[in-house]
Amino acid sequence: MSLNPDLAAYLQLVEAGRSAGKVLPMHALEADEARRQFEESSALIAGKADEPDCISDLSLTTRDGHTLPVRLYRPPQDDPALAGAALLYLHGGGYVVGSLDSHDTLCWNLAQDAGVPVIAVGYRLAPQWRFPTASDDALDAWRWLVEQAEALGIDAQRLAVVGDSVGGSLATILANQLAAQRELAAPRLQVMIYPVTDASCRRPSVQRYGSGYLLEAQTLEWFYQQYATVPADRLDPRFSPLLGSVASNSAPALMLIAECDPLHDQGVAYARHLEQAGVAVQLAVIPGVTHDFMRMGSIIEEADEGLVMVVEALQQHL
């Protein structure tokens, strides 16, 4: 399958900038500069949410006393069939880049199209905060959401967790932790959008799509190195969920995978891993697109198609 032509044209522009020395690959940058450039490119490919009256900035306190930013997106019109339902969103960015702002449009579109509130959390980033900080922050965010549900007008029994890239990793790690611990209300649905599930090895799709398809193999490795405190961290299920056991009562899963993504093979492998544990899985491989396609609504139609799949899964399970 060939690349979507509009996406291919965008990648040609990216490559032209690199060849001219105007843009460096992310793995050649310091973390702060990588974040700045990621935010700039996010504004170009995704745009900006246009309903500020429906968006509120909040905060939560983690187990170690750190304050995390939270953004609440309320839909302009609720879906009566999903009264009280909501979702926690965990953004992507390799544990190093990404923010509430970089995923603002995607979260707003989810809230608007699904007709449910979306709560996005800005977990701490590497290398300043290394493994397992991000997964701890995700669990703390879930606890906060459950505890604040009534005050927010949300039903803690009608929640989903959604994330893209490493946010998808955090989403499934969280869903599995909650299913195993049985301490807090667990999500009714976990949605993983091109997640990282195995940082321990290189699968064939890394060779096929690790250069020239937006997410570079060298950048992926750089992300892993920035987040891991020691190399063995990459074998921990909170880093590589494919390497851990799965609770059979984990939430049903929707997984969206890009065909032309170095993470393709590990995503497919993780879907099978969940199925073998008895978890219901809907796997969709989107042809002709790369990693991060869900944030490319200003470039390709597949972003909207993926959004429809997520909304339909929310309607089915919540």
From Swiss-Prot:
EC number in record: 3.1.1.113
Record comment: activity regulation: Inhibited by the serine protease inhibitor phenylmethylsulfonyl fluoride, the histidine reagent diethylpyrocarbonate and two sulfhydryl reagents, mercuric chloride and naphthol AS-D chloroacetate. Not inhibited by EDTA.
Record-annotated active site: S165, D261, H291
Field pH dependence: Optimum pH is 7.5 with alpha-naphthyl acetate as substrate.
Catalysed reactions listed for this entry: ethyl acetate + H2O = ethanol + acetate + H(+)
Broad EC category: hydrolase
GO MF annotation: an example: hydrolase activity
UniProt KW keywords: Cytoplasm, Hydrolase
Temperature effects on activity: Optimum temperature is between 35 and 45 degrees Celsius, with maximal activity near 40 degrees Celsius with alpha-naphthyl acetate as substrate.
Uses in biotechnology: Ethyl acetate is an undesirable coproduct produced in ethanolic fermentation broths during the fermentation of sugars to ethanol. EstZ could be used to effectively reduce the level of ethyl acetate in ethanol beers produced with the ethanologenic E.coli strain KO11.
Purpose: Esterase that catalyzes the hydrolysis of ethyl acetate. Can also use propyl acetate and the chromogenic substrates alpha-naphthyl acetate, alpha-naphthyl propionate, alpha-naphthyl caproate and 4-nitrophenyl acetate, with a preference for short-chain aliphatic esters. Highest activity is obtained in vitro with propyl acetate, followed by ethyl acetate. In vivo, could be involved in pyoverdine biosynthesis, but its specific role and its in vivo substrate have not been identified.
Oligomer and partners: Monomer.
Family: Belongs to the 'GDXG' lipolytic enzyme family.
Name of this protein: Ethyl acetate hydrolase
Species in which this protein is naturally found: Pseudomonas putida (Arthrobacter siderocapsulatus)
UniProt gene name: estZ
